[in-house]
């Protein structure tokens, strides 16, 4: 796996003078959104890596998940947002210090737009994936109900209340 484990990055790289804090904060906000959209949970710092790519005088950063066993399983919305895990707090603090809420929302919209573009590029594959995910019962009915209620309230969308599987919720989210 290419990249520095998130917990090592936080401990050993976050205070480097050559760290481009704004780029890292922007990428973490986008990573947070990718996890939420995909319902990829348990993104504690040891479950992702940070790739650093030299780009002229600065580095580019890309945060990538490396543990997928908690995808579309839990019933709590916060479980799918890396910002709520204690060991990610130093990066979350960096984000809140450098990026205002409006800009953060813009990055989230940008990430959702990119995901939508990828979806539209492969409609046949997405249709097959959706069919498989919506038929599979990977979580308990109680967790499906709880998450559909939380996301319905968050998005102000009653369609979530009709979801019967985590696959249904994932594709609506």
Positions of predicted regions on the chain:
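Short pocket-lining segment of the protein kinase catalytic domain that shapes the ATP-binding cleft
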Residues: 1-7
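Conserved kinase catalytic-core segment
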Residues: 8-79
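C-terminal catalytic region of ATP-dependent kinase domains
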Residues: 56-173
